[in-house]
Amino acid sequence: MKEKVIEKTIEWAKVITLAICMGLIVTYFIVPTVVSGESMYPTLNTKDYLIINKLAYKTGNPNRGDIVVFKTDLKSSDGEKKSLVKRIIGLPNDHLVIKSGQVYINDKLIDEPYLEDTYTAGDIDIKIPSDSYFAMGDNRLVSKDSRDSDVGVVNKNEIVGEVSMRLFPFKEVGTIG
């Protein structure tokens, strides 16, 4: 009888320890996010369920082409601050120009094979600050991103993490890249 109580206690301790570990992982290392809107189409679709790696940029920096989640001062329909999912286009100290529907970084036209429509609206000429990034959606015609003064450049401190994986829809489960 005493052995069964000890056995049950050990099993419960394992379950509780596992639950605490999972809670810590979700709290400090990853965060789930659901895509809202079509601004990252065709790479991401509305209602895609994503996993964000919160540790990705604790020791390193975002690279051009990374898809990130960042905080903004924009408000959602329920009045909460809104986070956006966008692609890093410009890096700190880059000279970014958008003219005639094309994006230039440091006087070179950039190749963006992930775009379905390559036209990029806007008339922008900016030197990106040393602690900031220029982020845009892949669906440039509908994306509210760094081209918009309500969003602007993204300070590294505002970046929540890198999109590392899509969990839903199931037919598209896998890494994002």
Protein language model annotation of sequence segments:
Residues A56-K58, L74-S76, L96, V103, ...:
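Solvent-exposed loop/turn segments at secondary-structure junctions
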Residues S83-R87, L91-K108:
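Mid-length scaffold segments of soluble, non-membrane domains
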